[in-house]
């Protein structure tokens, strides 16, 4: 990918520092020239509070949700941020302690209560966090910040004010939903979450939220389950972070990283476990891929199997002459990558960060090709007949289809992650370019563009600079897929630099067009979107 940059100064630690929200927007200092057509807001989510009083959060996905906004107008940029007033945040601020258990941090009963009150408080049921630090997405004319539980939080994208909490369980049968829904051109929202199916077994439901209609009724009120995927283990659902969608098909990748529901319901309530304590790996299952017909709402019984990997982000999925092309950011093996994302590990000195990353699963960008039509007469043969891929699908005697991928990118401890594409033009359709955040031993230190057809790579990188997920914004008169810009929030703690800036790159070659510097640190952000006026 590039000559590997070292980080002995440990500037990446600034990504994990608590900051205060802003009372008014800051005017950014622009160098270069922001395209005049770039008008709107870059909205992003991430943790901004890494401790409450003397109580620290322990995992990358624990800090309290901070909502960020960069406004673009006539070549000028302003920056604003506010904490999302979730129940988790408001109660923590009120009681000056961690009140609701987060991903890797346990909340314990109020020490001021007597022993009987503290004991009985364990039996009120599992209290699920609403800490919406992962992503933002539109539903109708509204915007919601989300994590991966059943709670989403409606926010005002102009003022960043928190409007209300919404419990998806009140509308559809899911225990939670991913932070990576698919949004169709008409505004229809698709998402996936696990649920309890027939005979108290676990399954995965695809939920659909329709677009806003003329009656202006909240589309969430009309949410429905459109198809259900079975679970390989009746009591242990897999961790699901994203899924694939095309105009006609839904693809769900079931990995060996499992949630032990017995541990979740018992140990959590009685002994103070957290989400991370409830994960375990099934070392023998490998990966199961599932497909459903989106329009007919029907599950296919094709048994796609492959070797084990972790999966967080789908890049894109599309149909090609009777096959589904599924491009994924994989991590080899069955061990859970999140085991390596505790803040203590991420804040270590550079040599220790590298040592920890060497123990973790190896990242790789892969393309899997799934044949949709299976003929038993083809047992033992490669069913993939497409000329432009080396991926294979072998029909086995037990009627499983064993998949081997084509590797699109692989580098030692160098990940292409947090992928983005020209989603409006190419989501669920054939495409050429993907943009990603380059992780160097888990440290984000480069931005990348990948040609998925030729495997050519372009890159932006500077010393002591730590970018975020790249967001592609198409220019109004675009003719080609990569006509536009890429936006990324960069933390820059090096000598002689401003604390942070918004970077604007030419999407063609990742050359710098402009940057908008601000006089404040910006902690790590995970995902977001560009909202046009």
Swiss-Prot record:
PANTHER family: BETA-CAROTENE DIOXYGENASE, RETINOID ISOMEROHYDROLASE. Fe cation binds at residues 180, 241, 313, 527. A lipid is attached at residues 112, 231, 329-330 (S-palmitoyl cysteine). Palmitoylation by LRAT regulates ligand binding specificity; the palmitoylated form (membrane form) specifically binds all-trans-retinyl-palmitate, while the soluble unpalmitoylated form binds all-trans-retinol (vitamin A). The modification Phosphothreonine is found at residues 101, 105. It catalyses: an all-trans-retinyl ester + H2O = 11-cis-retinol + a fatty acid + H(+); lutein = (3R,3'S)-zeaxanthin; all-trans-retinyl hexadecanoate + H2O = 11-cis-retinol + hexadecanoate + H(+). The modification N6-acetyllysine is found at residue 113. Interacts with MYO7A; this mediates light-dependent intracellular transport of RPE65. The keyword Phosphoprotein applies. Critical isomerohydrolase in the retinoid cycle involved in regeneration of 11-cis-retinal, the chromophore of rod and cone opsins. Catalyzes the cleavage and isomerization of all-trans-retinyl fatty acid esters to 11-cis-retinol which is further oxidized by 11-cis retinol dehydrogenase to 11-cis-retinal for use as visual chromophore. Essential for the production of 11-cis retinal for both rod and cone photoreceptors. Also capable of catalyzing the isomerization of lutein to meso-zeaxanthin an eye-specific carotenoid. The modification N-acetylserine is found at residue 2. It is a lipid-anchor. Retinal pigment epithelium specific. Belongs to the carotenoid oxygenase family. Its EC number is 3.1.1.64, 5.3.3.22. Binds 1 Fe(2+) ion per subunit. It comes from Rattus norvegicus (Rat). The modification Phosphoserine is found at residue 117. Keywords: Acetylation, Cell membrane, Cytoplasm, Endoplasmic reticulum, Hydrolase, Iron, Isomerase, Lipid metabolism, Lipoprotein, Membrane, Metal-binding, Microsome, Palmitate, Phosphoprotein, Sensory transduction, Vision. This is Retinoid isomerohydrolase.
């Amino acid at each position: 990918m590039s000559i590997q940059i070292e980080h002995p100064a440990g500037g990446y630690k600034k990504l994990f520092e608590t900051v205060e929200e802003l009372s008014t927007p800051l005017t950014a200092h622009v160098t270069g020239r922001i395209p005049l057509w770039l008008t709107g807001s870059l909205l992003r989510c991430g943790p901004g509070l890494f401790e409450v009083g003397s109580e620290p959060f322990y995992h990358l996905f624990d800090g309290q949700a901070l909502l960020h906004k960069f406004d673009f107008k006539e070549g000028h940029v302003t920056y604003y941020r506010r904490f999302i007033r979730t129940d988790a945040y408001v109660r923590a601020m009120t009681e000056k302690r961690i009140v609701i258990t987060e991903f890797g941090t346990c909340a314990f009963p109020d020490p001021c209560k007597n022993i009987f009150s503290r004991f009985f408080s364990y039996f009120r049921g599992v209290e699920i966090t609403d800490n919406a630090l992962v992503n933002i997405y539109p539903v109708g004319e509204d915007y919601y910040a989300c994590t991966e539980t059943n709670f989403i939080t409606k926010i005002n994208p102009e003022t960043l004010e928190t409007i209300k909490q919404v419990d998806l369980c009140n509308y559809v049968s899911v225990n939670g939903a991913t932070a990576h829904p698919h949004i169709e051109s008409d505004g229809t929202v698709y998402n996936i979450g696990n649920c309890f199916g027939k005979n108290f077994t676990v399954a995965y439901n695809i939920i659909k939220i329709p677009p806003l209609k003329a009656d202006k009724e909240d589309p969430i009120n009309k949410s429905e389950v459109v198809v259900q995927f079975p679970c390989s283990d009746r009591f242990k659902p897999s961790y699901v972070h994203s899924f694939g969608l095309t105009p006609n098909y839904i693809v769900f990748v079931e990995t060996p990283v499992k949630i032990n529901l017995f541990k979740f319901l018992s140990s959590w309530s009685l002994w103070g476990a957290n989400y991370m304590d409830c994960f375990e790996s099934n070392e023998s299952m490998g990966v199961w891929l599932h497909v459903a017909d989106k329009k007919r709402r029907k599950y296919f019984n094709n048994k796609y199997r492959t070797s084990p990997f972790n999966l967080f982000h789908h890049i894109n999925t599309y149909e090609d002459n009777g096959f589904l092309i599924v491009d994924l950011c994989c991590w080899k093996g069955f061990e859970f990558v999140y085991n390596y994302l505790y803040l203590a590990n991420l804040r270590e000195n550079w040599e220790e960060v590298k040592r920890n990353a060497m123990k973790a699963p190896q990242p790789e960008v892969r393309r899997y090709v799934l044949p949709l039509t299976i003929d038993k007469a083809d047992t033992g043969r490669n069913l993939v007949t497409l000329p432009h891929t080396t991926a294979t699908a072998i029909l086995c005697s037990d009627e499983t289809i064993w998949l081997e991928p084509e590797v699109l990118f692989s580098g030692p401890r160098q990940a292409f992650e947090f992928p983005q594409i020209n989603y409006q033009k190419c989501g669920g359709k054939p495409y050429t370019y993907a943009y990603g955040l380059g992780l160097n031993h888990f440290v984000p230190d480069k931005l990348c563009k990948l040609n998925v057809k030729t495997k050519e790579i372009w890159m932006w990188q500077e010393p002591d600079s730590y970018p975020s997920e790249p967001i592609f914004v198409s220019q109004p008169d675009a003719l080609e897929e990569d006509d536009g810009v890429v936006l990324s929030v960069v933390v820059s703690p090096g000598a002689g630099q401003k604390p942070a800036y918004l970077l604007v790159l030419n999407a063609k070659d990742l050359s710098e067009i402009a940057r908008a510097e601000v006089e404040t640190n910006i902690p790590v952000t995970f995902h977001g979107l560009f909202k046009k006026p």
